[in-house]
Amino acid sequence: MIAIFFSIAAVPAYAEEYSSQTEYTKAKDFVANINFDFFFSSSDLGEDVIADLKNIQDYITSHRDYTMDDLCDLVEPAKTRVNANHATKYDYSSLLPTSKDVLNAKEKEVFNSNPIYGLSVLLQASYANSQEKGRFGSNTWATNGDAFRHALWNALGTQFTSESYMRRFATAHETGSSDYDPNSIDTKMDLRNNATGRSLVKSMDLPSNPPNGMVIPYLISNNIATATKNGKLVRFVVAGVQYSTLRATNSATTN
């Protein structure tokens, strides 16, 4: 009994996030859903995230077996102090975070509680940003496109990490913002679309063994686009007019 006690005590805090799958299977499945070529060519991923991805790619190339804990150890924690110029490289008023450097204090706390999950959330943010731009173009604040992006990010994060982790990260993204106001319609819109994305993905019919790492994100994106078109999400800017109440979304291609 004593040996068992010490074995349990040595398990990292983030281990409880993982499913009941075997250590190796869970890690292999996790990596199989990362399309390294796609993310290496991303225009908005931070250099820190690219470096983490390269570490993972090198490690899995030279190691036959590895666990989620091994992958966690390959990801650099989010630093509490960063170069201010680097932190303002991207406009995060219209994009989701894709670098550890630009995360707020609450997001960094969640990221560091499970770095490999945190890295995945940033990767999913990059994918959601690109999908929104491809479908809706620019200037999407508070519109169909904005709603789509937040819901897609949360759906992807739930699928590839866990619902609880994605909920904590997305909530920290809102509540840790310097201009956070729980009563603002902007905050209410984001939190609601975040929650809807996490809920919708649980009922999606997704393949258990996709041929590559882009199949499931593509299917989830299409499902969220359909939900956007069918009014499952909310916005408060309609045809260029800003309203004081939330309105249902109505298109998967226009704002």
Where are these regions (language model features)?
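Intrinsically disordered/low-complexity terminal segments and short unstructured peptides
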Residues: Q21, E174, A225-A227
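Glycine-rich short-loop/terminal segments
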Residues: E23-A155, Q159-M166, T249-N255
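Sec-dependent signal peptide cleavage junction
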Residues: F5-Q21
